[in-house]
């Protein structure tokens, strides 16, 4: 009796449209795209369909500005990717796949101070409210992603600015809040969850 060869996960892919509700011109991505205007010919992205994998979208070219996690599914307009974020962004201009998301084996350690100093707490599950689980501060000074990929949020309930934190970026070591993302002006993180791949 022979068995089928083991198959890895399907390659990451998503389709972008320049109008809401999957209308207008479209472009399909299978890898990083630093500027959708140059590579895909779209001036803006107003709706997204993620076929495989998880992606990080950025509001500006060259992976700059606010980050938005895009997991498998449909995003017919900006409110679908912004969620309950206090930040309105109706444009996405650069994209990259999240390559290290493994929901079953994700681990991150939060530190109160910069450079992995002070009180610490290790997580391997989703936390809609870090203060409710005993994290005394509204800020996280630094963190280490041991495995997987995480999305941290500015406020409880997975609201506010999003920061995608991966083992494969910065070797999983984020020494201070400015390394969380280009839009990080504070270390305020109050909820965190594993990226769904």
Swiss-Prot record:
Domain Beta/gamma crystallin 'Greek key': residue ranges: 12-52, 53-99, 106-147, 148-196
Location of the region described as N-terminal arm in the Swiss-Prot/TrEMBL record: 1-11
UniProt entry keywords in alphabetical sequence: Eye lens protein, Repeat
SMART domains linked: XTALbg
Superkingdom of the source species: Eukaryota
Entry keyword Transport: no
InterPro entries: Beta/Gamma-Crystallin, Beta/gamma_crystallin, G_crystallin-like
Subunit structure: Homo/heterodimer, or complexes of higher-order. The structure of beta-crystallin oligomers seems to be stabilized through interactions between the N-terminal arms.
Protein's recorded name: Beta-crystallin A2
């Amino acid at each position: 009796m022979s068995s089928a060869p083991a198959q890895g996960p399907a390659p990451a892919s998503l389709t972008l449209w320049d109008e809401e509700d999957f209308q207008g011109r479209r472009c399909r991505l299978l890898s990083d795209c630093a500027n959708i205007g140059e590579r895909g010919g779209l001036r803006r992205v107003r709706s997204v369909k993620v076929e495989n994998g998880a992606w990080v979208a950025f509001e500006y070219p060259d992976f700059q500005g606010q980050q938005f996690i895009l997991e498998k599914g449909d995003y017919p307009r900006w409110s679908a990717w912004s969620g309950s974020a206090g930040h309105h962004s109706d444009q996405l201009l650069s994209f990259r796949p999240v390559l290290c998301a493994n929901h079953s084996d994700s681990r991150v350690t939060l530190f109160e101070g910069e450079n992995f100093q002070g009180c610490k707490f290790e997580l391997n599950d989703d936390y809609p409210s870090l203060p409710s689980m005993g994290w005394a501060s509204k800020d996280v000074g630094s963190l280490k992603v041991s495995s997987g990929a995480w999305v941290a949020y500015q406020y409880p309930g997975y609201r506010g600015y999003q920061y995608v934190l991966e083992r494969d970026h910065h070797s999983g070591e984020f020494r201070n809040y400015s390394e969380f993302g280009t839009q990080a002006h504070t270390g305020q993180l109050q909820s965190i969850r594993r990226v769904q791949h």
